[in-house]
């Protein structure tokens, strides 16, 4: 079965094919850079990173563009509060974004356009909307006239009347008086005297000011890809109004579809409530990592739910993800413990687990099912590793084990799950097997006596000497050596 993706526009699964046979274009709405990224952002950008990696695995060349919204009411407010310029605030949080995404092993985008870099394109697009009667000037602002776009609401599946009901309470009284329709939205905002200390407004034919949020993405998509992009993606909270408004702006000018596929990821929830900065229930990526959580465990947590489904964030889920990564990481390090013969890449492609993995991914990137395939391989390899290291010899031929391991590494990389090469430069004197067994026996005795301080001390002592312990459910302890740095 070819790759099928759920298209928000058609509200159904569709077989994916790009405009150009071997090249896929993707535009992902990026962050508004006024604060640090939280787990909801990790959820979005891990999802689109996996989409990109899987398309590459299928043989496509992928051009992935993700913007930064670096001018916005929230950024201006933060700059004013801090006594800084808008550019200073934006630059700080853009740098933090790159650090967070690198920690999560998210591939860099092909390009990261900033809204402030495309002001001429934005002005041209607004002028095109004015010329065609889709926009009007009011008090120095420019608004999009939604009533002029007959298919407004097609992405969210709602009529104007329904959308108006949802808009109640979101419109400032002064702004409402300038609008012809309550759902008309700002394409350009006139400069205000109180904002001059944090940014310099741009000149436009209708007056000095700055762009609205929605027009920025329309301009950046058009600059990067022309009229139509293969895939446009973002969080479900962007379906309306942001993506609905993007469609209205772009298609009114080009008369062509803005995107062939619209993909939206589900929310991260805390006690079933959406995690967001506005609700104050968010946890930043860097706070989680500062607590000692392995970035790959966080990535694994995100992947345990298919991207469109909600992901509930709990301490128990974090603990389970950390344990899962320990299992997977042990298998990924197998080559450091067991000599594996080389294999041909075709053997990975023809592996039954590769077929099962692709079946899961072809069903709208079902990472939960794909992970189940990966963990089956990991557990099989860990059993083989324990047998080999503890005198049991090979349970299967080295070639079979090597094929499994190379398949595991390849499939895990498609999900962006990659283990760093473990090393221990502190390892100076190698313990003998007998010394290791004696220390493990002493630790076991301490655990049975509930002397956990001594148990932990012995575990740490062994780890400092390059010996990693893996406690089993039956009470036994397996061990393996962590190679020292070359």
Swiss-Prot record:
Annotated Gene Ontology cellular component terms: cytosol
Motif 'KMSKS' region positions after renumbering to this chain: 274-278
Free-text comment on the cofactor: Binds 1 zinc ion per subunit.
Pfam families found in the cross-reference section: DALR_2, tRNA-synt_1e
E.C. numbers: 6.1.1.16
Localisation per UniProt entry: Cytoplasm
Cofactors demanded by this protein: Zn(2+)
GO biological process: cysteinyl-tRNA aminoacylation
SUPFAM superfamilies: Anticodon-binding domain of a subclass of class I aminoacyl-tRNA synthetases (SSF47323), Nucleotidylyl transferase (SSF52374)
Sorted UniProt keywords: Aminoacyl-tRNA synthetase, ATP-binding, Cytoplasm, Ligase, Metal-binding, Nucleotide-binding, Protein biosynthesis, Zinc
Gene Ontology terms for molecular function: ATP binding; cysteine-tRNA ligase activity; zinc ion binding
Motif ('HIGH' region): 31-41
Binding annotation for Zn(2+): 29, 217, 242, 246
Top-level EC class: ligase
InterPro entries: Cys-tRNA-ligase, Cys-tRNA-synt_Ia_DALR, Cys-tRNA/MSH_ligase, Rossmann-like_a/b/a_fold, tRNA-synt_1_cat_dom, tRNAsynth_Ia_anticodon-bd
Primary localization class, coarse: cytoplasm
Catalytic activity: tRNA(Cys) + L-cysteine + ATP = L-cysteinyl-tRNA(Cys) + AMP + diphosphate
Residues annotated as binding ATP: 277
Keyword Glycoprotein set for record: no
Keyword Zinc (UniProt): yes
Subunit structure comment from the entry: Monomer.
Stored HAMAP family: Cys_tRNA_synth
UniProt family annotation: Belongs to the class-I aminoacyl-tRNA synthetase family.
Protein name as annotated: Cysteine--tRNA ligase
Species whose genome carries this gene: Thermosynechococcus vestitus (strain NIES-2133 / IAM M-273 / BP-1)
């Amino acid at each position: 079965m070819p790759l099928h993706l759920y298209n928000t526009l058609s509200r159904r699964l569709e077989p994916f094919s790009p405009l150009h046979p071997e090249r896929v274009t993707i535009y992902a709405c990026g962050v508004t850079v006024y604060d640090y990224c939280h787990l909801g952002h990790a959820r979005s950008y891990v999802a689109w990173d996996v989409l990109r990696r899987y398309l590459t695995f299928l043989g496509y060349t992928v051009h992935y563009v993700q913007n930064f919204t670096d001018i916005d009411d929230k950024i201006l407010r933060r700059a004013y509060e801090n006594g800084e310029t808008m550019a200073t605030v934006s630059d700080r949080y853009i740098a933090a974004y790159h650090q967070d995404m690198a920690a999560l092993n998210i591939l860099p985008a092909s390009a990261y356009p900033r809204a402030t870099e495309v002001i001429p394109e934005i002005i041209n697009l607004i002028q095109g909307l004015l010329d065609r009667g889709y926009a009007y000037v009011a008090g120095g602002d420019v608004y999009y006239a939604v009533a002029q776009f007959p298919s407004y609401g097609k992405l969210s599946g709602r009529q104007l009347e329904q959308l108006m009901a949802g808009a109640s309470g979101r419109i400032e009284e002064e702004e409402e008086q300038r609008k012809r329709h309550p759902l008309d939205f700002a394409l350009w905002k006139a400069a205000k005297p109180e904002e001059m200390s944090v940014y310099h407004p741009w000149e436009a034919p209708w007056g000095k000011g700055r762009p609205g949020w929605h027009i920025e993405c329309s301009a950046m998509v058009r600059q990067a890809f022309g009229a139509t992009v293969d895939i446009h993606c973002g969080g479900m909270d962007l379906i309306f109004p942001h993506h609905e408004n993007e469609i209205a702006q772009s298609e009114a000018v080009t008369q062509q579809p803005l995107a062939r596929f619209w993909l939206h990821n589900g929310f991260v929830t805390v006690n079933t409530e959406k995690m967001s900065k506005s609700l104050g229930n968010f946890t930043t990526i860097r706070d989680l990592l500062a607590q000692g959580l392995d970035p790959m465990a966080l990535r694994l947590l995100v992947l345990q739910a298919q991207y469109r489904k909600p992901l509930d964030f709990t301490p128990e889920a974090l603990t389970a993800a950390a344990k899962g990564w320990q299992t997977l990481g042990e298998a990924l390090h197998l080559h450091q413990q067991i000599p594996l013969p080389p294999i041909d890449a075709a053997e990975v492609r023809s592996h039954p687990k590769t077929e099962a993995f692709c079946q899961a991914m072809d069903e709208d990137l079902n990472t939960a099912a794909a992970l189940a395939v990966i963990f089956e391989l990991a557990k099989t390899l860990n059993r083989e590793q324990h047998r080999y290291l503890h005198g049991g010899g090979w349970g299967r031929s080295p070639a079979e084990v090597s094929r499994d391991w190379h398949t595991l590494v390849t499939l895990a990389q498609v999900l962006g799950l990659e283990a760093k090469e473990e090393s221990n430069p502190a390892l100076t004197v190698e313990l003998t097997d007998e010394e290791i067994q004696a220390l493990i026996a002493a630790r076991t005795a301490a655990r049975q006596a509930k002397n956990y301080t001594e148990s932990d001390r012995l575990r740490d002592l062994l780890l400092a000497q390059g010996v990693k312990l893996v406690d089993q459910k039956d009470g036994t302890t397996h061990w393996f050596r962590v190679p020292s740095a070359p």
